[in-house]
């Protein structure tokens, strides 16, 4: 089977990672002790993608849990699924990264990274045919961002031909823990652009807005935000976990979704949106789902898709429904909104259907879009970065760990380049083909 090794780093990464395992274990009929109690062969057909089978028929997540302080791990260890993880796969330090990217990437994290890689190697060696890695982390803190990106580059060195996929939580002033989040995020994006194959941008700004506006929660908690994240992660991994034809592994997904190697930052979406504890009971139709799924309010990245254009889109419908209706609705969206899809990639919307819906819903849809509008998210962080960097505010925390100001300048310009690249393809039309080829040739030289 084509296995995936899952890593979770830092407080946020471990919290959303733990939720992810709770949700998918439930979908695959696996209880908190790792025992299967399901009712459908579909649940077990591709169980090996995320789980190892241990003695006594127990299923163990192929997960490596990493943090620079013991706190979050302790809560995973005392959480509902505490027995399911392999005890050796908890790797943690004592010092913490103090929300400092440099500590995660260069000092504290660098000391712990080898023991993490030992566990990763062990998991990879027991795989029959490893397809790649997925990391859950945030970009605003110290461990998930700094050490997370360090792990990515180390794993890249050792497994250069495996796919690297991340679920990256992007910081927002609306849900902020630290004032230096823009620094940490910019330094991280600088790494992600070069070293990952696919990154799902999960934006705290958007999660907060969904909880506040759509779900009418006046004071959203991290629990509420993480509920949305787990629904989204469950949705985007459906094709990897259940039998099906489309985007059935990480590489096929990358081939369909990434037209240019640097532009691999996806905007996820989910429909129907429900708050924790009140999954809706009203019947949904395929047209409803399709309409909601493309709605800006359902995007997990705070960007207006209407301000940009889609390079590529993948949609995953779950539940019992008519394939014919799904195809008709998806074509309908594209025909009605053709100006929002670049015309120089024909058939750039792909759809998959899985029979098993998520818990509590009859049907759902998950959206993965590679939209040029994601530049708005990078612009937002870049502006906050520049405001502080211009005054060299808080820099001493980073230079004190051995970093150079030059690295900040490089990260800043790399992110600005990324924004310009998205803009370039947003403006591109099919007629200009010739000009592009010339530019590409110049760049190649």
Swiss-Prot record:
SMART domains: Tubulin (SM00864), Tubulin_C (SM00865). Residues 425-445 are annotated as: Disordered. It comes from the Eukaryota. Some glutamate residues at the C-terminus are polyglycylated, resulting in polyglycine chains on the gamma-carboxyl group. Glycylation is mainly limited to tubulin incorporated into axonemes (cilia and flagella) whereas glutamylation is prevalent in neuronal cells, centrioles, axonemes, and the mitotic spindle. Both modifications can coexist on the same protein on adjacent residues, and lowering polyglycylation levels increases polyglutamylation, and reciprocally. The precise function of polyglycylation is still unclear. Disulfide bonds: none annotated. This is Tubulin beta-3 chain. A motif (MREI motif) lies at residues 1-4. Tubulin is the major constituent of microtubules, a cylinder consisting of laterally associated linear protofilaments composed of alpha- and beta-tubulin heterodimers. Microtubules grow by the addition of GTP-tubulin dimers to the microtubule end, where a stabilizing cap forms. Below the cap, tubulin dimers are in GDP-bound state, owing to GTPase activity of alpha-tubulin. TUBB3 plays a role in dorsal root ganglion axon projection towards the spinal cord. The lineage of its organism: Eukaryota, Metazoa, Chordata, Craniata, Vertebrata. The modification 5-glutamyl polyglutamate is found at residue 438. Highly expressed in testis. GO terms for molecular function: GTP binding; GTPase activity; metal ion binding; structural constituent of cytoskeleton. The keyword Zinc does not apply. InterPro entries: Beta-tubulin_BS, Beta_tubulin, Tub_FtsZ_C, Tubulin, Tubulin/FtsZ-like_C, Tubulin/FtsZ_2-layer-sand-dom, Tubulin/FtsZ_GTPase_sf, Tubulin_C. GTP binds at residues 11, 69, 138, 142-144, 204, 226. Belongs to the tubulin family. Its cofactor is Mg(2+). It comes from Gallus gallus. One of its GO terms (cellular component) is cytoplasm. Pfam families: Tubulin, Tubulin_C.
């Amino acid at each position: 089977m084509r296995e995936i090794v899952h890593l979770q780093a830092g407080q946020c990464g471990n919290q959303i990672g733990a939720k992810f395992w709770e949700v998918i274990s439930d979908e695959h009929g696996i209880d908190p002790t790792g025992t299967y109690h399901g009712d459908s062969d579909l649940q077990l057909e591709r169980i090996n993608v995320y789980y190892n089978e241990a003695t006594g028929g127990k299923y163990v997540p192929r997960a490596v849990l990493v943090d620079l302080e013991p706190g979050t791990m302790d809560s995973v260890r005392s959480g509902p699924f505490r027995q399911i993880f392999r005890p050796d796969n908890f790797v943690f330090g004592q010092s913490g990264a103090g929300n400092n990217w440099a500590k995660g990437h260069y000092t504290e994290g660098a000391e712990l990274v080898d023991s993490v890689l030992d566990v990763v190697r062990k998991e990879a060696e027991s795989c029959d045919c490893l397809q790649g890695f997925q990391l859950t982390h945030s970009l605003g803190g110290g461990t998930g961002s700094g050490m997370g990106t360090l792990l990515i580059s180390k794993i890249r060195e050792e497994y250069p031909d495996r796919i690297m996929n991340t679920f990256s939580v992007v910081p927002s002033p609306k849900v902020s823990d630290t004032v230096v989040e823009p620094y940490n995020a910019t330094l991280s994006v600088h790494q992600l652009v070069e070293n990952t194959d696919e990154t799902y941008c999960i934006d705290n700004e958007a999660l907060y807005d969904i909880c506040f506006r759509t779900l009418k929660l006046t004071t959203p908690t991290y629990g509420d935000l993480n509920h949305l994240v787990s629904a989204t992660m469950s949705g985007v991994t459906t094709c990897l976990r259940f039998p099906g034809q489309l985007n059935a592994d990480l590489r096929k997904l990358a081939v369909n979704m990434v037209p240019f190697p640097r532009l691999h930052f996806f905007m996820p979406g989910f429909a129907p949106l429900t708050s924790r504890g009140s999954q809706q009971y009203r019947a949904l139709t395929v047209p409803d789902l399709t309409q909601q799924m493309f709605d800006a309010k359902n995007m997990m990245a705070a960007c207006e898709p209407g301000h940009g254009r889609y390079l590529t889109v993948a949609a995953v419908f779950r539940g019992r429904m008519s394939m014919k209706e799904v195809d008709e609705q998806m074509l309908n969206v594209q025909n009605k909104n053709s100006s929002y899809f670049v015309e120089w990639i024909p058939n750039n919307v792909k759809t998959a259907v899985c029979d098993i819906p998520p818990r509590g819903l009859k049907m759902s849809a998950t959206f993965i879009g590679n939209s040029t509008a994601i530049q708005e998210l990078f612009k937002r962080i870049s502006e906050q970065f520049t405001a502080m960097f211009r005054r060299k505010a808080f820099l001493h925390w980073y230079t004190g760990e051995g970093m150079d100001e030059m690295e900040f300048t490089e990260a800043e310009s790399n992110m600005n380049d990324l924004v310009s690249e998205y803009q370039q393809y947003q403006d591109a039309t099919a007629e200009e083909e010739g000009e592009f080829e010339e530019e590409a040739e110049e760049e190649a030289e």
